[in-house]
Amino acid sequence: MKVITLTGYKAHELGIFSHNHRGITYIKKAFEQQILALIEEGVEWFLISGQLGVELWAAEVVIKLKQTHPHIQLAVLTPFLEQESQWQEASRKKYHDILEAADFVDSITKRPYEGPAQLRLKNEYLVQKSDGLLVLYDEDKPGSPSYYLEVAKKRQQQEPYDIRLITPHDLEWIAQEDEMNDSVDIDNL
């Protein structure tokens, strides 16, 4: 595997409405663990569509890891032009920072938003262009990642395609580990 698509829920689907929500830390840690494992397996490119939430947080992880793994690359393949036009200013700034740090940026349809067909095309395109999918997903709460998974599972039926899930259980484990580390630090003061 050389290319992996990173995705998951939009921030609002997770009930996250602030850029400093503690849950983002756990999501980033989970992605960092998985991305490091993927780098060890030979993955060089990480793809996102740039949607708010998990994709941008995962992109921040890739950008951070480029400091110690300079051979990895980030591509942002947006479903349409100006997808950030309706976002809040803080989100637009974070998005533009990621675009600046990315190694490749392009729009799949090269047109402004016209309809949901562009989003379906984005899912199909990113799955087609990658060797696997790393997705934050809860089977009890399908949400937007289910569209990626549907396309990925179809591809998996025809040829090898790696699908890796980060689950709520994984995040819970990271949060518990973090709390244990915090309590250990307090005890050592």
UniProtKB/Swiss-Prot annotation:
Domain of life: Bacteria
Annotated InterPro entries: YspA
Pfam families, alphabetized: YpsA
Alphabetized Gene3D superfamilies for the sequence: 3.40.50.450
Family as reported in the entry's similarity comment: Belongs to the UPF0398 family.
NCBIfam families: PRK13660.1
PANTHER family named among the record's database cross-references: UPF0398 PROTEIN SPR0331, UPF0398 PROTEIN YPSA
Name of the protein in its database record: UPF0398 protein BH1768
